[in-house]
């Protein structure tokens, strides 16, 4: 993990904040702060241990504090194990704070872009080697949301990565 920010600004436009949320409210990572009515806009969650320092018309500001001893832990959720697909899965992911607009469109073939985003940026390939289970899980979740028949992983030409059961395109 990297350094934690001292102050976090969260966009609250369009969100209905949870009742009782106000300045000085203690927050912890994964705490629900607001819900968005749009089906493809992820709900709003705290990302750090801290307290609400300010709420404006457009933002919620969180000031970092040391975690309290009684702060709840966020429990992992096994979305694959729940067997959800399509809109039901997209709604479950939305309730976890993920914007799903580009994830849930139905398609026959889903192409996952694993290319480095910009020239000189070289983190994508090491991630493909060291985080294979995360990659598989993410690809399966995306496949289920899009109800795709085929999933292809696009990797850089000359890439040395290979995965059992995952077709590659160069």
Regions found by a protein language model. Give the residues of each.
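A structural signal for short beta-strand/turn segments enriched in small hydrophobics and glycine
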Residues: 24-33
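Short coil-to-beta-strand transition motifs
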Residues: 41-48
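N-terminal, Lys/Arg-enriched amphipathic/low-complexity engagement segments
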Residues: 1-20, 35
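Conserved hydrophobic positions within beta-strands
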Residues: 50-52
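Buried, small/hydrophobic-residue-enriched core segments of structured protein domains
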Residues: 46, 56-170
């Amino acid at each position: 993990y990297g350094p934690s920010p001292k102050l976090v600004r969260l966009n609250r436009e369009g969100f209905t904040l949870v009742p009782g949320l106000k300045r000085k409210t203690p927050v912890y990572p994964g705490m629900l702060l607001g819900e968005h009515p749009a089906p493809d806009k992820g709900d709003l969650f705290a990302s750090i241990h801290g307290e609400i320092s300010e709420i404006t018309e457009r933002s919620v500001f969180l000031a970092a504090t040391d975690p309290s001893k009684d702060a709840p832990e966020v429990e992992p959720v096994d979305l694959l194990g729940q067997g959800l697909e399509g809109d039901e899965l997209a709604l479950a992911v939305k309730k976890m704070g993920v914007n799903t607009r580009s994830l849930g469109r139905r398609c026959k073939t889903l192409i996952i872009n694993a290319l480095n985003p910009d020239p000189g940026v070289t983190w994508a390939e090491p991630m493909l080697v060291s985080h294979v289970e995360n990659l598989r899980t993410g690809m399966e979740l995306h496949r289920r949301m899009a109800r795709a028949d085929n999933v292809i992983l696009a990797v850089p030409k000359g890439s040395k990565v290979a995965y059992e059961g995952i077709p590659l395109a160069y």
